[in-house]
């Protein structure tokens, strides 16, 4: 899975952002900057599209790694991005006090939703559109918090697999410190995507590509050499988490007239 023409892809995504913003009547956007590669790529795409009308919002919690904030600030300094830090720690600590039995994952999901609230409040205050940062791998696997990091008005990278994001990041001159570190949702201390999912993005993305783009069945995936455990995990996640990327079903009322 190699990007053959990253320059053309950037132009396509920049055009997408400009067209969608114009259609919705917005000139400014806000991006939640985590210090990871996905939000870094989105911020650079927005900068290419609308320049200084981008604002980056850094929203660390009490368990966010120091490295995450440092890397987000590094990106802002290198590309002169308008930004500010708004800690969600007070919201998180209030949640912990209300729910002392909460597990790290539950707290992490709450923090993702606190960030969504913070982004959308800033969006309303400044008349800015919230731009999403979820990649295709995460969306297909349901690896995100519903109404948390999945909430946005536009998503320029939602059709790009994680391994493609890394390639695009290099083309956009994202700092190596961000590209080379282990991907993490930073939901709790020591968390990493690949550790939690149990497989590397290289392996998962190749399987996802074969299944989604090439339409290979479970039997064909196994015949191609994909590990059985990986195939079963990925197909199960796609099936059980599909609802996360769909609007809630609305009951159709019959016999009204």
UniProtKB/Swiss-Prot annotation:
Cytoplasm listed as a keyword: no
This protein's UniProt keywords: ATP-binding, Ligase, Magnesium, Metal-binding, NAD, Nucleotide-binding
Annotated residues for binding of deamido-NAD(+): 113
Pathway: Cofactor biosynthesis; NAD(+) biosynthesis; NAD(+) from deamido-NAD(+) (ammonia route): step 1/1
Binding sites annotated in the UniProt record for Mg(2+): 38, 138
Ligase listed as a keyword: yes
EC number: 6.3.1.5
Superkingdom field: Bacteria
Catalytic reaction equation(s): deamido-NAD(+) + NH4(+) + ATP = AMP + diphosphate + NAD(+) + H(+)
Annotated GO MF terms: ATP binding; glutaminase activity; metal ion binding; NAD+ synthase (glutamine-hydrolyzing) activity; NAD+ synthase activity
Residues that, per the record, bind ATP: 32-39, 133, 162, 184
GO cellular component labels: cytoplasm
Gene Ontology BP, a term: NAD biosynthetic process
Functional description taken from the UniProt entry: Catalyzes the ATP-dependent amidation of deamido-NAD to form NAD. Uses ammonia as a nitrogen source.
Protein family according to the UniProt entry: Belongs to the NAD synthetase family.
Subunit structure: Homodimer.
Protein name according to UniProt: NH(3)-dependent NAD(+) synthetase
Organism: Wolinella succinogenes (strain ATCC 29543 / DSM 1740 / CCUG 13145 / JCM 31913 / LMG 7466 / NCTC 11488 / FDC 602W) (Vibrio succinogenes)
